[in-house]
Amino acid sequence: MFCVQCEQTIRTPAGNGCSYAQGMCGKTAETSDLQDLLIAALQGLSAWAVKAREYGIINHDVDSFAPRAFFSTLTNVNFDSPRIVGYAREAIALREALKAQCLAVDANARVDNPMADLQLVSDDLGELQRQAAEFTPNKDKAAIGENILGLRLLCLYGLKGAAAYMEHAHVLGQYDNDIYAQYHKIMAWLGTWPADMNALLECSMEIGQMNFKVMSILDAGETGKYGHPTPTQVNVKATAGKCILISGHDLKDLYNLLEQTEGTGVNVYTHGEMLPAHGYPELRKFKHLVGNYGSGWQNQQVEFARFPGPIVMTSNCIIDPTVGAYDDRIWTRSIVGWPGVRHLDGEDFSAVIAQAQQMAGFPYSEIPHLITVGFGRQTLLGAADTLIDLVSREKLRHIFLLGGCDGARGERHYFTDFATSVPDDCLILTLACGKYRFNKLEFGDIEGLPRLVDAGQCNDAYSAIILAVTLAEKLGCGVNDLPLSLVLSWFEQKAIVILLTLLSLGVKNIVTGPTAPGFLTPDLLAVLNEKFGLRSITTVEEDMKQLLNA
């Protein structure tokens, strides 16, 4: 086992990465190794998808499957080894079908890629794990060095984050052939184990640029189906009655669950990255969408144990449900998996609803505590002139984009302290689950404009980018000249690709934490600092002083 893709990876003087029987996320060595095997199979599939496009062959089954299967290897998504192997077998079957299509056009069709003809050696998981050793990401570290390995992983993990957003968009009916062609090209190239530093750096920027387009079609999918989010108050306390909790990012799953629970007497609560769903008109119209439950994903083993109903996980993040003994009432959807947990293959939630009706639910309603969400792209753009007016009248000094992933590391209290230290004449724009560090606190307003503005999920960084570009255009300056600072927390691969997106768009002087990614060497961090001004957090006092005086 070698995995260094998330923030909680093991860090030692000898090197970074989980490499024992089990990773810090709870992923076993077996599952981790089989995910490496799956990635190799997907690289071979992409190699043939690139070749097929040369013949004008576009296979939509391949295009929809490839990013979805890659998504299953993202942190805290799928811990079920047999399902990972199932994805690998499906990748190979699709590859062979695509290969046959190519050969039907050109009998001499060939692909020069080491993954192009990969076959699984056995049905036995142990044998497959041994085969996977051939594809462990650091297998040639001694030959290429830590810097090349780190850049490869930056590209691989960034592309994995983009693949997750591609799947979210695909679920909502969004498809862009250019994006899929670019995805396959990059995925296939990474399967050749590239070792050129400049080429890898260029690839990382290409991934960021591609992901901006992915976030654009995801935004179109969400707003097209569920309307543009508008500011909405959400109760974060319990309401009496039977209940279901839904977590993850998939708004379509939430919509289907709301439709199917309507009139059943079962209330629905959002968790984690589902919180922004309350801002969408077509979702909040369901009166039994009663509130948001819990805090950051890392607290779920305590909070889910206390929730008196079933829980549905639609995407990341799931962690071991046996710890809180709620594994008999947590359900996985789509690419999510945990051994022994019931999985919903389709969009029928009747079994979950039946379980909710058999459980006690909340015995009484607590005193409501309301927070505000729903500052989507349209709302943010509508406030652009107000922001400019406040700045011109010196009522608004600075905007801090304070967002990203949450996690268990104690140093993450920095983000709470930073938010509460922001001066009263400054605004906080937040997104993703890092907001749970401070989103239940009171921040007041500036002439009626809330000082805490929740823009949505991690992918809604797109809205923040569009706002920044709009403000810059109206003020006749560059984005980096705005009174705007980005202070981002990271945990997994979606955050990595958001960072690459920002860097590829030329955004500079981003501050990140609580730690640097374990796969980025001091040399690589120095390169990113020199090219983009990217740096790690220090203390709240020092960072606040530097950012306000920038």
UniProtKB/Swiss-Prot annotation:
Superkingdom, taxonomy of origin: Bacteria
UniProt-listed InterPro entries: HCP/CODH, Hydroxylam_reduct, Prismane-like_a/b-sand, Prismane-like_sf, Prismane_a-bundle
Cited Pfam families: Prismane
Record-listed [2Fe-2S] cluster binding positions: C3, C6, C18, C25
One GO cellular component, as annotated: cytoplasm
A GO BP entry: response to hydrogen peroxide
Gene Ontology terms for molecular function: 2 iron, 2 sulfur cluster binding; hydroxylamine reductase activity; metal ion binding; peroxidase activity
EC number of this enzyme: 1.7.99.1
SUPFAM superfamilies: Prismane protein-like (SSF56821)
Cofactors (names): [2Fe-2S] cluster; hybrid [4Fe-2O-2S] cluster
PTM sites of type Cysteine persulfide: C405
Record's catalysed reaction(s): A + NH4(+) + H2O = hydroxylamine + AH2 + H(+)
Localization in the cell: Cytoplasm
Keywords (A to Z) from UniProt: 2Fe-2S, Cytoplasm, Iron, Iron-sulfur, Metal-binding, Oxidoreductase
Cofactor note: Binds 1 [2Fe-2S] cluster.
Chain segments annotated as coiled-coil in the UniProt record: none
Binding site for hybrid [4Fe-2O-2S] cluster: H249, E273, C317, C405, C433, C458, E492, K494
NCBIfam families recorded: hybrid_clust, PRK05290.1
Function per UniProt: Catalyzes the reduction of hydroxylamine to form NH(3) and H(2)O.
Family statement: Belongs to the HCP family.
Descriptive protein name: Hydroxylamine reductase
Organism: Shigella flexneri serotype 5b (strain 8401)
Gene behind the chain: hcp
